[in-house]
A protein has these predicted regions:
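Serine-dependent carboxylesterase/thioesterase catalytic core
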Residues: 1-10, 14, 18-106
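C-terminal catalytic-base region of ester-bond hydrolases, centering on the histidine
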Residues: 101-176
Length: 176
């Protein structure tokens, strides 16, 4: 799990704890504070992904800037990436996930940090955008986001279906 700008593994700890309770081997990025792009980040993420790929392709979850790192990593190593889930990431036109990797962009119109339109990417056969209610800084603690992530991770590798909120949670998703 990759934190946003200025974030660390402590930032993503609650969401990783939740995923571990569901049986996933959720791990932090292990690179200290996310201070942007650089060779040390690229090399560190490549090393981290290689260490995780022993059990097969890994799903990458990136919050804000962490989502941009996830997309760049998936472009370099699509064979080692099972899926990408971005949370409030300013993807724009430059960071559209590679078509060979299933991708979900979670965004909020009330983000207040990242303009929500930058998180909306063209949808496709294995690419979707899911709108939630909430703030940018709250995305990692938002039950609607946790539900999307849990649902996406639970999908079989060979079958991709867009996210559909359970009836009891539909009010959490303005457009779905």
């Amino acid at each position: 799990m990759l934190p946003g700008l200025g974030g660390t593994d402590a930032t993503t700890a609650p969401l990783r704890w939740f995923l571990r309770q569901l049986g996933y081997g959720a791990v932090g990025w292990g690179l200290g504070r996310n201070e942007g792009f650089g060779r040390h980040v690229t090399a560190g993420l490549d090393t981290r992904l290689a260490s995780l790929s022993g059990g097969g392709p890994a799903s990458l979850i990136g919050w804000s800037l962490g989502g941009l790192h996830a997309v760049k990593l998936a472009r370099r190593r699509p064979d080692a990436v099972r899926s990408i889930i971005t949370l409030g990431s300013p993807l724009g036109d430059r960071y559209v996930p590679p078509a060979v990797v299933p991708a979900t962009s979670v965004y909020s119109r009330s983000d207040a940090i990242v303009p929500w339109r930058l998180s909306v990417v063209p949808t496709g056969p294995r690419r979707e955008c899911v709108e939630v209610r909430g703030s940018h800084l709250g995305l990692g603690h938002n039950p609607a986001v946790a539900l999307v992530i849990a649902d996406r991770l639970a999908q079989r590798v060979d079958v991709w279906e867009p996210f559909t909120a359970p009836r009891w949670a539909r009010r959490w998703y303005p457009t779905g």
